[in-house]
């Protein structure tokens, strides 16, 4: 397994692979890898000749009061996981490699970023789309693998790839959970013991909503009320948003008539966690 830090070096390796007509699976990450990332890597390994994982904490997708400086980093642990699951190359550039000069060009995806995290984290998806555009151009992958836990990100990236004619297939992979139901996240490392216990309220509230939907409830306000009521019973939980949106357009819906995304963002103490599920009639 190679660990490469420069665009020049990674392009040389990729040119060789492309000359040999090898398919490339790409897993973009910010590091501090866990079983959720491992599931993406395993899927990429099954479907491609070569697998690349990028590890880059992207500064332009963080807001001024967000956790860029404290975001957990552990390249030794990450490298071990990547090697275990058969990654061929880790691309781990410095910020100065990705952004050697002040950046004036940005990628925006409209409409899909109006709600959910797009509304609550201004500029976040512009940063995500801009850095992924750079990575797609540098790495030229055949397929890219993203987790469904970041459901809005998955939808936004799919639309960007479609609109800009990137010759890349975007593959969404299911949420991976702890045994007690908490969605795997690098930010779970921030939680103390009590917060970790309190964080289970996210999945519990979504389960109650899913039960109501499966019992025939079609009013999105009622579904939202079920989730809010459950979350409000947890003293350490502070709701950022609870949204029921069309799973394709990500626009709010009142009456549930087709496939919907039920998505929540909740602060447990100072840690912001997200979770979701998709429901199809």
UniProtKB/Swiss-Prot annotation:
Which sites bind (R)-pantoate?
Answer: 61, 153
Record-listed ATP binding positions: 30-37, 147-150, 176, 184-187
Q: Name one GO molecular function term.
A: ATP binding
Q: What is its main location?
A: cytoplasm
> What does the subunit comment say?
Homodimer.
PANTHER family under this entry?
CYTIDYLATE KINASE/PANTOATE-BETA-ALANINE LIGASE, PANTOATE--BETA-ALANINE LIGASE
Q: What is this protein called?
A: Pantothenate synthetase
The organism of origin for this protein: Clostridium botulinum (strain Okra / Type B1)
- Top-down, what is the taxonomic lineage of the species of origin? Bacteria, Bacillati, Bacillota, Clostridia, Eubacteriales
Gene encoding it?
A: panC
